Curated annotation (Swiss-Prot):
GO terms for molecular function: glutamyl-tRNA reductase activity; NADP binding. Possesses an unusual extended V-shaped dimeric structure with each monomer consisting of three distinct domains arranged along a curved 'spinal' alpha-helix. The N-terminal catalytic domain specifically recognizes the glutamate moiety of the substrate. The second domain is the NADPH-binding domain, and the third C-terminal domain is responsible for dimerization. The record marks 99 as: Important for activity. InterPro entries: 4pyrrol_synth_GluRdtase (IPR000343), 4pyrrol_synth_GluRdtase_dimer (IPR015896), 4pyrrol_synth_GluRdtase_N (IPR015895), GluRdtase_CS (IPR018214), GluRdtase_dimer_dom_sf (IPR036453), GluRdtase_N_sf (IPR036343), NAD(P)-bd_dom_sf (IPR036291), Shikm_DH/Glu-tRNA_Rdtase (IPR006151). PROSITE patterns: GLUTR. This is Glutamyl-tRNA reductase. The gene is hemA. It catalyses: (S)-4-amino-5-oxopentanoate + tRNA(Glu) + NADP(+) = L-glutamyl-tRNA(Glu) + NADPH + H(+). NCBIfam families: hemA. The active site is at 50 (nucleophile).
């Protein structure tokens, strides 16, 4: 079996081409199932974002797996396989785990270190597992990758190094309030910046996120997409909404201010508009304009570079851990066999003991059973640890056969597998 990743991403493709090779959320489950029916594909998972469309797969042979994945994608997007192939990057074997760990931590993103990719990968994994297209290898790889990414986000405080003006504004609000529980945010103006800000704010912990746009239907559409804590408000209620929320982010494109703020207002305001959306009549306000936000972004550049390097330095060990696990897959039946063999002997000895000592009450029987199981587990703990270590050495097959003979498990036939099988 081989790991494989077939990728269409921003490194090779400009936006106008990436748009042609993307799946909608509704299409991904169907595509996962259809791809899984192709020859050579044992496991598969598909992810599609604005920066990449990728298939992660376990295939029985590299050349056939590569062909059928390419053919599937080419047919889906109505290309000939020859024309489609020039857009594709294929990664195989050891390099797949390294690639995934870079992608899921944001190191391979257009904006380095961006945290959204973790959520997108989690969603893709959940869809694939629900559709039944993943198995032992992809399940383990993606669970490990998700755990690793979460650990990196916590360890290096990734979310604090904002990557866009909207993210920087949200970070400033979080710094102001600490906890966002019970807080309400208004997002005014739903162009590219405002829309992305709304998407990011929707899962930050605000109790409500209120959307306002000069075209009310756009606010309603985005609120319907996001649901949860996100609600639309009519634009003619702007003044009332801003006065009653805890914080507001303005991101509209206007020539004249949309709102006048004086010292009577307690709302924290982040103004990303150029020209500014808010006319400020007091220096006492909690007000941040786009220059303040850019200062945050610029101050984070060096911190972000160091963060990215630190995360990159941790990836090789994570990759090594995965491939040690993969190499040990073939030893799983042996370990399971040893446990079952040992428990069977323990069970027979326990039954024999009860026949010889029928006067034992239920409590005494439970104590004896517990201690017998403990003895068995302690006895096999050492051998299991040793055979796991031996299973990744060049002479693994002979060692495993000898191990089985020692413990009376000659009936177990185990094939040695390495990275190339």
């Amino acid at each position: 079996m081989y790991l494989m990743c077939v990728s269409l991403n921003y490194h090779q493709l400009p936006l106008d081409l990436r748009e042609k090779f993307s799946f909608t959320k509704e299409e991904v489950p169907k595509a996962d199932k259809l791809l899984n029916d192709e020859k050579s594909i044992l496991e598969n998972l598909l992810i599609s974002t604005c920066n990449r469309t990728e298939v992660y797969a376990v295939v029985d042979q590299i050349h056939t797996g590569r062909y059928y994945i390419r053919r599937f994608l080419a047919e889906w997007f109505h290309y000939t396989i020859d024309d489609f192939t020039k857009f594709v990057t294929v990664t195989t074997k050891d390099a797949v785990a390294e690639h995934l760990f870079k992608v899921i931590t944001g190191l391979d993103s257009l904006i380095k270190g961006e945290p959204q990719i973790l959520g997108q990968m989690k969603d893709a994994f959940q869809i694939a597992t629900k559709e039944g297209t993943t198995g032992a290898i992809l399940n383990h790889l993606f669970r490990q990758a998700i755990t690793f990414s979460k650990r990196m986000h916590t360890k290096y405080r990734v979310s604090e190094l904002a990557q866009s003006s909207g993210q920087a504004g949200l970070h400033q609000i979080k710094m102001q309030f600490g906890s966002l529980e019970g807080k309400t945010l208004a997002v005014v103006g739903l162009g590219q910046i405002g829309k992305h800000t709304a998407y990011n704010a929707s899962n930050m912990g605000f109790s409500k996120v209120l959307l306002l746009n000069r075209t009310d239907s756009k606010a309603e559409q985005i609120a319907t997409e996001l649901q949860g804590v996100v609600e639309a408000r009519p634009f003619n209620q702007l003044a009332t909404v801003v006065h009653n929320v805890d914080a507001a982010i303005f991101a509209a494109t206007v020539k004249q201010p949309l709102f006048k703020a004086d010292e009577q207002i307690s709302t924290m305001i982040v103004d990303l508009g150029v020209p500014r959306n808010v006319a400020v009549n007091s220096t006492k306000l909690k007000y941040y304009d786009v220059d303040h936000v850019h200062m945050i972004l610029n101050s984070n550049d060096e911190k972000r570079r160091l963060m990215i390097q630190k995360i990159a330095n941790e990836i090789p060990q994570e990759v090594n851990d995965f491939y040690i696990w993969e190499k040990q897959l073939h030893i799983v039946p042996v370990i399971r066999g040893l446990r079952e063999h040992s428990l069977r002997i323990e069970g027979e000895a326990y039954d024999s003991l009860l026949r010889k000592l029928p006067e034992l009450d239920s409590h005494e029987r439970k104590v004896i059973s517990k201690h017998m199981k403990s003895i068995v587990n302690q006895m096999i703990k050492g051998p299991i640890k040793e055979i796991k270590e031996l299973s990744v050495t060049p002479g693994a097959t002979a060692d495993i056969d000898f191990f089985c003979k020692i413990f009376g498990m000659d009936n177990l036939k185990v094939e040695n597998q390495n990275n190339d099988k």
